[in-house]
């Protein structure tokens, strides 16, 4: 059965209460899990500054400013994790830097996602692989070559603990047999940089209905 993941991303708009509301919304919509994003704005902006495809998606906003608006403070993570577990939601996180992985390991992160933009970042791949935890690779249209290149990294032996999951922007049903599909979730009354490609609760409920058949 396809696992349905609600991506919290930066749709909390810098509010812990909104982040908790997103977890409540994910549970009410029928998601199986929530995913967080763990990064420090300055470090992520530095690591991505040379990526033209990232700049193309930033709308001309300096990357560090964009990431400051969308990051989830590390001090929130224990609270968010407890809240997700209260609602019987599984949780995991993306990590974008080896230091993020080290932090998430202190919280016993059960699995990690490598985002599409980091799939050829050998430092983060190595750091995550060394945890021994399951890994989720992000699948987007036309990224097959990138996945192939990522799996050729020396010392990385991808196995049954590596999953391919569709990271969907907007309303997109998963490809048949997908083990996982991830949708960005938003609140009706909060506008954020991620809101335009995120689903409201009713839309996520509809996708759950379609996927579950």
Predicted regions and their residues:
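Catalytic cores and adjacent flexible loops of soluble metabolic enzymes
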Residues: 1-213
């Amino acid at each position: 059965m396809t696992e349905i993941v609600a991506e919290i991303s930066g749709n909390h708009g810098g509010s812990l209460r909104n982040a908790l509301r997103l977890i409540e919304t994910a549970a009410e919509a029928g998601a199986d899990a929530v995913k967080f994003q763990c990064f420090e704005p300055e470090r992520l902006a530095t690591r991505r500054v040379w990526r033209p495809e990232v700049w193309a998606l930033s709308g001309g906003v300096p990357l560090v400013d964009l990431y400051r608006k969308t990051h989830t403070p590390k001090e929130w993570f224990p609270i968010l994790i407890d809240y997700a577990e209260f609602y019987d939601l599984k949780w995991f996180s993306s990590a974008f830097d080896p230091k993020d992985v080290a932090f998430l390991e202190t919280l016993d992160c059960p699995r990690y996602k490598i985002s599409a933009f980091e799939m050829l970042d050998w430092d983060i791949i190595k750091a995550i692989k060394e945890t021994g935890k399951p890994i989720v690779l992000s699948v987007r249209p036309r990224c097959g070559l990138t996945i192939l290149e990522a799996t050729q990294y020396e010392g990385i032996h991808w196995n049954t603990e590596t999953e391919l999951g569709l990271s969907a922007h907007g309303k997109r049903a998963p490809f048949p047999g997908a083990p996982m599909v991830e949708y960005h979730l938003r609140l009706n009354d909060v506008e954020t940089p991620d809101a335009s490609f995120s689903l409201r609760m009713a839309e996520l409920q509809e996708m759950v209905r379609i996927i579950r058949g």
